[in-house]
Each structure stands twice: as structure tokens, then as C-alpha cells.
Amino acid sequence: LGYFHHLVLPPFYYKNPSVNGLVNNYSEIINRIDNKHLKIYLYNFPQLSGIQLGVDLVEILSEKFPKNIVGYKDSSGDWDNTSQIMEKCPQINMFPGSEIFLSKALEKGAAGVITGTGNVNPGMVKQTYEAFYNDKKKSIILQKKIDDFRTAVQKYPLISALKGLIEYYRKDEGWQYLRPPLTALPKADLKNLIQSIDPLEFSLKS
């Protein structure tokens, strides 16, 4: 299909793999695909995978496959990990998994963010990114807004909250139907969430 950029989780059925085991796993993926255009973004999400993709692994893989291992999405929420990888592997395109880290990550050379809440608040996240380079005073104001938005949303189960917001603002009840085991956000919680974020003047549009 022509898609060469891939966000790749570690294999997480067996827990506590060694660094060498993870190196072998990603090496197998790259060697078997055997395509010079392949670009892999390591996906660190230990809360779900149970595996931390640490700086030692990133250093080894980026040295072994400099043209294939090109980025890292850090959904751990651990700023120390994000910062350490940017310092030790500056050639890696870093994408924190929360917009709360956007401005300070850009300060250290990050490429941007890949954030779930960006699905419902894309415009403000984009504006914050652009203002960082063009209008620092504006970027500070916008960063506070996206911080407040994220903080409000993550008080609830994330997917349920995001789909509830899309249902409400698009007036489309189809968004309240989630695949099990996920469930729709209770109406009272959705009402409270809307009251929290309405003053932030966000938009579903990018």
C-alpha cells in the first residue's frame, strides 16, 4: 500500500524480556521486511504493554539500524525517560504521548507529539506547536489551555471520554457505542467534563 512509517509496540505476551531479546525482535522485523524505505517509530507504552523501551535499547537499535529506527513515541508519561532519550539519542524523532509535554519537549528538540486527546482538540494543539516557533507569549497561553484540557479529560477513562465528546459536539449518538470491554461515559460524567472544557474555547476542527 505504500505505507513505510510504522509505530511498533514491543511483543508483550511474555513479560520482562531482556534488552538483547528486544533488539532481536526489532531486528527480525527490519530484516524480514527488508525494505530500504522502512521507518520504525518505537512505541513506549509500558502501562499497557508491560515493557519499558529504555534508553539502552534505543541507543543500540538506532546505531544498528540508523536508517530504519527513526523515532520514538513515549506514552509512559515519564518526562525523565523522554528527556533522557532526547539527550542521548538526538538523532531520534521524539514524540511525547501527551500534549502536556509539548512546549518543554520542543525546547529540547522534540519533533512534536502524538496524543490521543488531539483527536478532539487538534486545532489548539496545532496552534500551540506553531506559536512555539512564532510567538512565545501566545504559546505559553495556549500551552496552559491544552494542559487544562488534557487534565480535565484524563480524569475519566480516556477512550470513553473522547468518544463522549465527539458524540456531544457532533450530535451523533453512534459514538456512544464502544466495543467491549470499553463502555460509554456516564451522562453525568460527560456533563461535568463538558462544563470543564467549554471555557477553553476548543474545537473538534483542526
Regions found by a protein language model. Give the residues of each.
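Short, electropositive alpha-helical surface patch
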Residues: 1-4, 58-64, 169-172
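Active-site beta->alpha loop and helix N-cap motifs at the rims of alpha/beta catalytic domains
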Residues: 1-52
